[in-house]
């Protein structure tokens, strides 16, 4: 959604136009929109459903009621695979893929980890039997509370193997430990989200893209370690 689309890009790194990229990846787009006005609406009303269309439908009820259901199985890897580091293997890590960004596995490999990427249907018993040095729970889409099976598997892993959850993985860990999550009125989006270390004096500038948060008051088995400096919401928990 843009105010004005450039049809003749000139950057030396550009391989194709925005229009060609969107068509190649089957992504809808629209130009000529007053994006500042849209921003003001979202600022006051919060996150809402929207549609790109050539005419306003007579009945908006289906649009208002629309919601994405069970998205994690749609974006997970269908089969396990392993990525090796360039040098010696220092650790073996299982990365449970709930919609993982490639950079997570890439950064683990840089640190000497052999990363086995597992589908979201992975069983806790199989993970423990494989003897991994640690388990990484990836980012992913949707309402964390809908992932009942994944939460149960994480609960079986708690206290038995070192774990680190990021984004959805962090939220699922909190749910597995008895906490709860809720939808943010204003999701955290962008590359400049400030996060405070509650046990120190540092504030980190982070990249975020999530619309749900862990309820800090429900984290009984852990301690809130990081909080968003803008709205005070939970950003990280130590268990």
Task: Walk through the language-model features, giving the residues of each.
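RNA-binding accessory domains that recognize and position tRNA/RNA substrates
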Residues: 1-125, 129-130, 144
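Hydrophobic beta-strand scaffold residues
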Residues: 28-29, 115, 163, 181, ...
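Short amphipathic alpha-helical segments
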Residues: 43, 106-109, 147-150, 175-179, ...
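Beta-strand-turn-beta hairpins that frame and shape the catalytic cleft
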Residues: 87-93, 200-203, 239
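Hydrophobic residues at beta-strand termini and immediately following loops
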Residues: 96, 118, 184, 227, ...
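Cysteine-nucleophile active-site neighborhood
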Residues: 134, 139-205, 211-213
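Catalytic beta-strand/loop cores that center a nucleophilic Ser/Cys/Thr
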Residues: 202-239
């Amino acid at each position: 959604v843009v105010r004005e689309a450039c049809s003749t890009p000139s950057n030396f790194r550009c391989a194709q136009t925005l229009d060609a990229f969107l068509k190649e990846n089957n992504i809808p787009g629209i130009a000529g929109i007053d994006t500042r006005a849209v921003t003001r609406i979202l600022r006051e009303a919060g996150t809402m459903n929207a549609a790109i269309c050539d005419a306003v439908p007579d009945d908006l009820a289906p649009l208002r009621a629309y919601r994405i259901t069970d998205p994690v199985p749609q974006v997970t890897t269908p089969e396990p695979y392993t990525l090796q580091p360039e040098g010696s293997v220092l650790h073996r890590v299982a990365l449970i893929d709930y919609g993982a960004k490639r950079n997570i596995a890439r950064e683990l490999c840089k640190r000497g980890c052999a990363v086995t990427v597992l589908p979201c249907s992975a069983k806790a018993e199989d993970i423990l039997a494989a003897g991994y040095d640690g388990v990484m729970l990836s980012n992913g889409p949707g309402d964390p509370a809908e992932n009942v099976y994944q939460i149960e598997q994480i609960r079986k892993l708690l206290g038995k193997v070192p774990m680190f959850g990021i984004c959805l993985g962090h939220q699922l860990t909190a749910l597995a430990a008895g906490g709860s999550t809720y939808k943010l009125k204003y999701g955290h989006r962008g590359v400049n989200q400030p996060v405070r270390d509650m046990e120190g004096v540092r504030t980190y500038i982070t990249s975020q893209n999530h619309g749900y948060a862990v309820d800090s008051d429900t984290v009984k088995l852990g301690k809130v370690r990081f909080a968003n400096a803008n709205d005070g919401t939970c950003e990280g928990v130590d268990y």
